């Protein structure tokens, strides 16, 4: 089978390619020009939706994959990926019902097209040949295509799964979910509360779903109710609020996932989905979760009074533009620089190579939105960074750091194929580079971005950590084979993290939305943050530019296991869990050594800001 030569890193778009992808270029130019003219992307997005959806239908309908020419195939699929990314971007804006319907039709069209692509017999032959190639970029691409085919569900199964997941989400946000408070009622609880107030308390008390009217009221109730027994009763009832609604759709999700696992020869979906991870068995995940378990001296329903007694972490208030400047100054040692086109538009370079554009806008919350993913030799990236005008609270700084880290991670990938940059395998290795960059950028200020000891923020972080640990245990157990669970008694898992009992703990899976979407992989966020911390602590003597190239750029397309081996010497589950344990006890120790070959012996080591 003929295979085209990889394009040079600085190659541009040929006229024919530019013509075939002109609508996406028009869309990108539209967004860039709106930023240059001071027009908010939120105002421009609705006008671009019809253009995008028209292109979506046309492109998907005419999609005929050319498996005999890899470079042509990459350009064809790149068009689909770009449309899908732009679709996700526009869905983040307030749109009319008609515009949402247009985007939904586009999403369905893209899903059907990708289903046809992954079902093509020629794709199996292509990945087989790529797996035998000596080029690491091609091997990485083959690995990702193989994984997508393995995870692929038929149209009917996918429709049933997505329908059940949608029913679960709807079941938890229905307006007619009510609690009978009885003697535990408080006056005025029927009135809506301001979601902007008591944000730390609300986030700590709410479930994983976005706060709605009822969730805000529950958070406020727990803050105001002085009777601990009433708090416990209402909290437990709230956690089981959607049991009747979600029992059937969640059972459908379990059955579909079990069927998928059996089709691949695994006894449970937990065994199947974990088989390709760094933590490759349910027992590996359980060991990590047990190592991350730390019993708090209060119950979840008693968090409110604990927060009320604590003080907030004091921070220095800075403008969003000042925070952005400080962060980009801290990126310079990594080889990253920014060319300012105007106040709202930056071009980002890495050692002189253009990575893409960063559009800056103001909003109520710090966040990152991806418009177009960077692919070396194919296209530069484009992201929008939304920043609050004033960064006042600790959370403001933390989310600003996280948002810029996400933007830089999206722009800096060194893959020459879209999937090599967008799909990190194994999945529990994905996000580790971004999490490391967050830790690095947290040192950009003269003050610490860690909560003060005993502060509200520290209490909330500790609570959220243990809540995630408990949820991960519930998710893991829910998808394991009957009689072979790592956590057969979930009430004991709850009591290991919290100072309280919960007899109806089995109700939790019905009001825990992420269980149907992420399943046994719910532990990923915890794991990635902890692994990034272990890398950070272990490599404080390394030049951070080396770590940035290794963890985020990865132009040589090294598998994550090989990169972790270069850092830790081994990358088996037991070694990584031990490194995480060590990092938790050695976090504030400095080191002047670096495990990476060819490291800069003159590098003095990275120092953290002074602790509070």
Model regions and ranges:
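N-terminal secretory signal peptides that target proteins for export/translocation
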Residues: 1-19
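C-terminal, non-catalytic "cap/extension" segments appended to globular domains
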Residues: 43-46, 335, 408, 472-612
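Active-site recognition of the HExxH zinc-binding catalytic motif
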Residues: 386-414
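Generic, well-ordered alpha-helical scaffold segments in large soluble proteins
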Residues: 237, 252-263, 272-275, 288-295, ...
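Structured, charged N-terminal subsegments at the starts of enzyme catalytic cores
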Residues: 166-304
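Metalloprotease/metallohydrolase-associated module, dominated by Zn2+-dependent proteases
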Residues: 294, 424-504, 612
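Active-site-proximal, well-structured secondary-structure segments within enzyme catalytic domains
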Residues: 211, 225-226, 250-385, 443-448, ...
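N-terminal helix-rich structural modules
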Residues: 27-33, 41-201, 514, 520, ...
């Amino acid at each position: 089978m003929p295979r085209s030569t990889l394009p040079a890193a600085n190659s541009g778009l040929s006229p024919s390619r530019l013509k075939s992808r002109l609508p996406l270029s028009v869309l990108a130019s539209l967004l860039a020009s709106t930023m240059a003219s001071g027009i908010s992307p939120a105002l421009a997005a609705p006008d671009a939706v019809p253009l995008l959806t028209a292109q979506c239908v046309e492109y998907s309908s005419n999609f005929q994959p050319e498996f005999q020419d890899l470079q042509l195939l990459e350009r064809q699929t790149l068009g689909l990926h770009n449309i899908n990314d732009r679709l996700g971007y526009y869905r983040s804006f307030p749109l009319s019902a008609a515009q949402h319907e247009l985007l939904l039709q586009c999403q369905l069209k893209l899903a059907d097209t990708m289903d046809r692509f992954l079902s093509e017999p020629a794709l199996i032959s292509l990945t087989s040949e790529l797996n035998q190639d000596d080029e690491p970029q091609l091997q990485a691409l083959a690995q990702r295509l193989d994984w997508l085919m393995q995870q692929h569900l038929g149209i009917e199964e996918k429709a049933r799964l997505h329908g059940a997941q949608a029913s679960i989400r709807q079941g938890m946000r229905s307006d007619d979910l009510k609690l009978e408070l009885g003697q535990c009622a408080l006056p005025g609880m029927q009135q809506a509360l301001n979601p902007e107030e008591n944000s730390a308390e609300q986030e700590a008390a709410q479930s994983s779903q976005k706060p709605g009217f009822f969730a805000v009221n529950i958070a406020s109730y727990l803050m105001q109710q002085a009777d601990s027994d009433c708090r416990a009763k209402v909290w437990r009832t709230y956690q089981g609020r959607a049991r009747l609604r979600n029992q059937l759709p969640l059972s459908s999700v379990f059955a579909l996932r079990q069927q998928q696992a059996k089709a691949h020869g695994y006894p449970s979906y937990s065994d199947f989905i974990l088989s390709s991870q760094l933590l490759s068995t349910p027992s590996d995940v359980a060991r990590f979760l047990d190592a991350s378990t730390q019993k708090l001296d209060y119950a979840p329903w008693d968090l409110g009074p604990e927060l009320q007694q604590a003080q907030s972490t004091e921070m220095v208030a800075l403008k969003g533009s000042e925070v952005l400047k400080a962060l980009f100054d801290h990126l310079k040692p990594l080889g990253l620089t920014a060319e300012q086109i105007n106040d709202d538009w930056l071009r980002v370079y890495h050692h002189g190579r253009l990575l893409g554009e960063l559009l800056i806008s103001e909003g109520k919350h710090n966040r990152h939105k991806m418009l177009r993913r960077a692919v070396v030799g194919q296209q530069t990236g484009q992201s929008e960074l939304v920043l609050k005008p004033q960064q006042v609270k600790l959370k403001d700084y933390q989310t600003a750091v996280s948002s810029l880290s996400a933007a830089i991670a999206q722009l800096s990938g060194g893959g020459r194929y879209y999937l090599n940059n967008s799909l990190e395998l194994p999945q529990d290795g994905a996000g580790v580079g971004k999490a490391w960059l967050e830790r690095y950028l947290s040192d950009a200020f003269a003050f610490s971005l860690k909560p003060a000891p005993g502060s509200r923020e520290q209490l909330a972080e500790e609570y959220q950590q243990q809540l995630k640990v408990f949820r991960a245990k519930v998710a893991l157990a829910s998808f394991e084979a009957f009689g072979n669970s790592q956590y057969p008694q979930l009430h004991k898992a709850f009591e290991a993290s919290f100072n309280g009992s919960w007899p109806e703990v089995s109700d939790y899976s019905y009001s825990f939305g992420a269980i149907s979407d992420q399943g046994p992989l719910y532990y990923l966020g915890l794991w990635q943050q902890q692994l990034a911390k272990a890398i950070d602590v272990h490599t404080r003597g390394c030049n951070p530019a080396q770590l940035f190239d290794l963890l985020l750029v990865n132009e040589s397309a090294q598998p994550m296991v090989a990169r972790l081996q270069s850092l830790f010497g081994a990358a088996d589950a037991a070694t990584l869990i031990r490194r995480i344990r060590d990092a938790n006890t050695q976090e504030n120790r400095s080191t002047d050594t670096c495990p990476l070959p060819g490291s800069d012996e003159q590098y003095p080591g990275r120092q953290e800001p002074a602790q509070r």
